[in-house]
Amino acid sequence: MKNGKRVYLFIILLILISAATYIYVTMFMPSSKRVDHSTYYGVKDKQVAIIYNDGLQKASAIEQDKEVYLPYDWAVAILNDKLFWDSEENLLVYTLPEEIIYMDENYISDGKKAFIKSDNSAYVSASLIKKYTNVNLRSFTDSDIRKIYIYDNSVSLVSARLKKKSKLRSGETIKADIVADLDKEESVYILGSSVTDGDLTGKNKKWLKAYTDKGDWGYVKVSALENMDYVVNISEFVKPTYTSISFGEPVVLGWHQVSNMDANKNMESLVARTSGMNVISPTWFSLSDNEGNYTSYASRDYVTKAHEMGLQVWGLVDNLSKKVSTVKLLKKSSVRKLLIEKLINDAITYNLDGINLDFEGLNAEGA
């Protein structure tokens, strides 16, 4: 009988030990599994993972000739909307306040091609992006898994040092897979929203998102860190100022239908029947093809008389001709450039105060 009780107690003890072991392993024992880096970063071959501020992006870049090239669509949507890709003429166009830069496939910026093409998509040089955008970047392209870190200069970046050996993990838990081993006194950089004002030390958090000097990215335990301090971003970027002209008062505009030169003679009698108008817009210019040409009924004498009557003259440009596809016209940088130059020349020739673009039927593709 006593032997039976002993066996029973032994079995109960084994069950308790097994349960305790299971609970410990499940809840408290750190994972020793390591991530597959290609799967973790979502890249392979010459693709480059993009970490922007503190987030891994779905889009990936390309490395070529020791330069990282960012996908145009992503760069414009996230970093700089002043860039324009002309797929018709394979030109990258950048608009500055006082000039427009046209970059073809041979255009070199800081020793690098401004863009490359892959699978019919455009990729923009990261160095070019940095030159014209208020960001800092750091790329790691010597390892099998390539990465580029891009962060706005307005985003906090904090450096820290490991006070003991630790692990960089794929999530905010010891059960998350290991991304990299961290050595004592190794430096890490804490990104973006992981650091908030008044919480430099991470005292309100157990884990912080960070990357290492080797380019690894993941989560590190706050308890393993010391010597946390803000990194001072040094950038030569000067944000351009895009100015505009204000009329200074409400615009009261009247259109004047002009379909031939003789119609210009009616301006004075038509204006006499109006009240409070300060701008007249004669329909002088009409696009005639997809190459930037247009018909013109402009008159210097008309403008002189209008000015004497206290009116500004804004020549109207329309796209009503059935021969014109405005989408095709606007897609080509050379045509847009020609059209702009011709309109400016006519504005100077006829002493116009402005140009009134009346392009109808534009959809999102042509906008």
Predicted regions, residues:
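Primary recognition of N-terminal secretory signal peptides and signal-anchoring hydrophobic helices
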Residues: K2-S194, E226-N227, I234-Y242, S246
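Solvent-exposed, polar/charged alpha-helical surfaces in well-ordered, non-transmembrane soluble domains
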Residues: D73, A77, S127-K131, A180-K184, ...
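Boundary/entry segment of secreted carbohydrate-active catalytic domains
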Residues: K165, K221-E268
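Short, solvent-exposed loop/turn elements at domain surfaces
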Residues: L168-G171, D197-L200, N260-M267, S288-E291
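SH3/SH3-like beta-barrel fold
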Residues: E185, K206-T212, V220
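Short, Lys/Arg- and Gly-enriched loop/turn segments at beta-strand edges
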Residues: V195-A210
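Alpha-helical scaffolding within the catalytic cores
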Residues: I234-K239, M261-S269, Y297-Y302, L338-N345
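Chitinase-like catalytic core of GlcNAc-active glycosidases
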Residues: E249-H256, S286-A367
